[in-house]
């Protein structure tokens, strides 16, 4: 059983309480340790990510779920930028979140299912 790190707790501030609950339950049952690397996002940060082509939302006319506190980004502990997006740890981690979301009766959308944003989890 894993517990939320200081970094995860900090990054969950301002995030919808349902996502906080989701993270807590997922950590308790996950076979893969993970960290929440981003939650609530400022307009300035969103604009920066858009300019860097790291987001499709410009932060002004197209608001990100992160700006509403309705999305988180998670990485498994030990993740490296050189790891394959097909790494089995992603599948295990996302499966844990899907299972937990179902148990909590949450409607979630996963960047993993889009095929290009593995860390992203948002409330529908």
Where do the PLM segments sit?
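Short amphipathic alpha-helical surface micro-motifs
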Residues: 16-19, 53-58
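Catalytic cores and adjacent binding grooves of peptidoglycan-active enzymes
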Residues: 56-124
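Short linear motifs at secondary-structure transitions and domain/linker junctions
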Residues: 9-13, 44-53, 96-98
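Active-site acidic/histidine clusters and adjacent loop/turn architecture
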Residues: 1-35
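Soluble non-cytosolic domains of exported or imported proteins
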Residues: 9-17, 40, 84-91
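Extended, low-complexity, intrinsically disordered C-terminal regulatory tails
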Residues: 25-56, 103, 107
């Amino acid at each position: 059983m894993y517990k939320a790190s200081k970094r995860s707790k900090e990054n969950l501030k301002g995030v919808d309480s349902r996502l906080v609950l989701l993270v807590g339950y997922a950590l308790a049952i996950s076979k893969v340790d993970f960290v929440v690397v981003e939650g609530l996002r400022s307009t300035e940060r969103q604009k920066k990510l858009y300019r860097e082509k790291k987001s499709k939302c410009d932060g002004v006319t197209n608001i990100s779920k992160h700006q509403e506190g309705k999305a988180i980004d998670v990485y498994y502990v030990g993740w490296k930028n050189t790891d394959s997006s097909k790494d089995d740890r992603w599948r295990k981690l996302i499966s844990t979140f899907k299972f937990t979301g179902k148990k909590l009766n949450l409607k979630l959308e996963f960047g993993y299912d889009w095929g290009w944003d593995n860390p992203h989890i948002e409330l529908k």
